[in-house]
């Protein structure tokens, strides 16, 4: 099973640049085209939050226009830049989304790997949290299929990155989440967005990775006094490849037209 993860496209209204520097809409369209060019194509696309930038209806209308060109099934979760009500309205045809409250869900109909989405967003705030109710829901949901390889998807990552301005807006309650995940050995990966960079660490007895953005990259600055900044690095996405004999292998794919391929000499 091949699962693409696109994150943080920050779609804007037509003609408006993201952060005044990037045409995030055009970049997202290119990312979708890159998915279609893969051979084999992914079986599923995960969209791991911050699908629009300001949470407005015009942005969601533009997002749905762009997603009409996506020929692969997709699963979505909100990020801190999304508005929960507007998000739910925009994706009212996605019947796996709950009608009210946090957008937790589990879907296992697209292939061998089950996707369990944990909504850690807090309306009106940029940091996230795993509360007791969310942890209990996750524990019970994972217990339902203990033998099924599973990806847990959430937006804000539950660890300190070392980038000071990112860590202000991390997901709180990481120890609570780790305690739950460590009880369920079928969790092959926790996948997040939010930080606009690829990061990887061990967490709760499994691997956790964050996806890059399809638009700007948040600057990698590890000094305590560093100020928030973005770079126009090549956008990218992740490709998670499940094979029973191997497990889940995650690939990082920059988006763009690059020279090659060149045969090995």
Regions found by a protein language model. Give the residues of each.
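Extended active-site neighborhood of metal-dependent phosphoesterases/phosphodiesterases
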Residues: 57-144, 149, 176-186, 223-242
């Amino acid at each position: 099973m091949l699962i693409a993860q696109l994150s943080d496209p920050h779609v804007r209204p037509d003609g408006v640049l993201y952060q005044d520097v990037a045409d995030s809409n055009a970049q997202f369209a290119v990312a979708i085209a890159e998915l279609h060019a893969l051979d084999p194509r992914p079986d599923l696309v995960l969209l791991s939050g911050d699908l629009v930038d300001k949470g407005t209806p015009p942005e969601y209308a533009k997002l749905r226009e762009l997603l009409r060109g996506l020929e692969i099934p997709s699963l979505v979760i909100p990020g801190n830049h999304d508005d929960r009500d507007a998000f739910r309205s925009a994706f009212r045809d996605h019947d796996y989304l709950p009608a009210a409250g946090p957008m937790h869900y589990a879907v296992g109909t697209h292939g061998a790997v089950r996707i369990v989405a944990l909504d850690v967003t807090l309306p009106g705030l940029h940091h996230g949290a795993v509360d007791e109710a969310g942890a209990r829901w996750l524990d019970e949901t994972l217990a339902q299929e203990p033998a099924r390889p599973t990806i847990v998807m959430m937006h804000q990552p539950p660890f300190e990155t070392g980038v000071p301005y990112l860590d202000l807006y991390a997901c709180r309650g990481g120890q609570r989440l780790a305690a739950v995940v460590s009880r369920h050995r079928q969790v092959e990966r926790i996948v997040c967005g939010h930080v606009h960079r690829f990061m990887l660490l061990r967490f709760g007895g499994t691997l956790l990775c964050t996806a890059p953005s399809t638009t700007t990259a948040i600057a990698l600055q590890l000094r305590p006094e560093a100020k928030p900044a973005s770079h126009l690095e090549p956008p990218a996405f992740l490709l998670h490849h499940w094979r029973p004999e191997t497990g889940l292998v995650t690939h990082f794919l920059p988006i763009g037209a690059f020279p090659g391929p060149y045969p090995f000499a």
